[in-house]
């Protein structure tokens, strides 16, 4: 996003769904109490949320209630985790720019979200900070705490959150994947929750890299999209010394999205008021498109919020949603390593039209 823009908390939250049991010659046994089936590597993880006709979340389903298809071919469900099993959450706090006045609100909202999680659920947190490199300040990604179930340690980490002078949004998402979502070696579900407007200002990475990193992990991605555009546009007009600026990378991205061929100024201060507003409008549209795309592809959701005061309700909805998410896993019957995208479809047996199913849409197969 832009330097000094009202930024928000980005919560990344993690679902651990990888199986650890070695696959021997005998098939893994099913545990009747929690309908758990556990197997091994190269498992395709599929988070699934089921709702009834009025949108209420449905609990109590079993592995035998589901069917999963890959490119139209039914697959054998090798792993099933119920909605009662714990999950891991990573919170990414975006407190760049003018959110200085909102830090207490951000901390309270995050603290309530943590308190609403169940025993056994764990949390990790990432935030932004300002580093000084070669005499110049630069926004950076900061790991506040690794995944932990210690609520006291988490609240202490929240107290240490400060502000930054930029928004390395994409870098932070990649950092969450690398430092909090990967590995662990435990049979836990994972989910990523992001609170913010989704507009990057200082990252070295791009959205495509975020997609490439997150989609293979098989986690559901949720966004609380906070509308910061009115604040930004109010500050875009007038003296450039006080106006919010986009990075050179974002300006190039803006012109590229329009297919513009003419050489344009990469200095935001040299743009006129109307072009600054056009840049703002288009970059927010791109951010909205990216959030919707990633959430839909992974089986997550986007929760709109006009400001931070609505974040608490959105957090509560997400906590309920991920607390009733099932996790299916299968080994693809297509053994080709062709690097092609494979579409996933999940259905409920004998309940067609009665319940709605939201699930991961697909994945890209490995290539030789």
Residue ranges with predicted function:
Residues 1-6:
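N-terminal secretory signal peptides that target proteins for export/translocation
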Residues 9-19:
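Bacterial N-terminal signal peptides
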């Amino acid at each position: 996003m832009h330097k000094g823009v009202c930024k928000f908390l980005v919560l990344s939250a993690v679902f651990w769904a990888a199986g650890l049991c070695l696959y021997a010659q005998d098939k893994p046994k099913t545990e009747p109490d929690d309908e758990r089936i556990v197997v091994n590597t190269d498992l395709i993880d599929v988070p699934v949320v089921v709702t009834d006709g009025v949108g209420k979340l449905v609990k109590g389903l079993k592995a035998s209630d589901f069917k999963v298809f890959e490119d139209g071919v039914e697959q054998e469900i090798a792993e099933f985790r119920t909605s009662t099993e714990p999950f891991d959450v990573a919170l990414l706090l975006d407190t760049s720019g003018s959110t200085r006045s909102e830090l207490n609100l951000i901390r309270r909202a995050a603290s309530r979200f943590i308190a609403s999680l169940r025993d056994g659920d764990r949390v990790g947190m990432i935030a932004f900070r300002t580093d000084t490199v070669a005499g110049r300040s630069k926004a950076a990604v900061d790991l506040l705490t690794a995944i932990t179930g210690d609520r006291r340690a988490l609240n202490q980490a929240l107290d240490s959150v400060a502000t930054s002078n930029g928004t390395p949004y994409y870098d932070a998402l990649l950092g969450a994947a690398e430092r909090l979502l990967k590995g662990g070696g435990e049979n836990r579900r994972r989910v990523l929750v992001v609170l913010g407007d989704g507009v990057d200002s200082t990252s070295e990475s791009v959205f495509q890299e975020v997609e490439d990193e997150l989609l293979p992990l098989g986690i559901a991605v949720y966004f609380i999209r906070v509308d910061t555009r009115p604040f930004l546009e109010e500050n875009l007009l007038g003296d450039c010394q006080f106006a919010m600026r986009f990075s050179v990378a974002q300006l190039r991205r803006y012109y590229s999205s329009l297919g513009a061929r003419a050489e344009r100024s990469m200095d935001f201060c040299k743009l006129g008021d109307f072009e600054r507003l056009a840049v703002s409008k288009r970059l927010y549209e791109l951010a909205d498109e990216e959030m919707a795309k990633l959430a839909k592809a992974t089986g997550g959701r986007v929760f709109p919020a006009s400001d931070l005061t609505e974040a608490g309700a959105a957090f509560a909805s997400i906590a309920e949603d991920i607390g009733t998410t099932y996790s299916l896993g299968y080994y693809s019957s297509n053994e080709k390593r062709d690097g092609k995208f494979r579409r996933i479809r999940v259905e409920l047996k004998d309940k067609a039209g009665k319940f709605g199913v939201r699930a991961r849409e697909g994945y890209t197969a490995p290539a030789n």
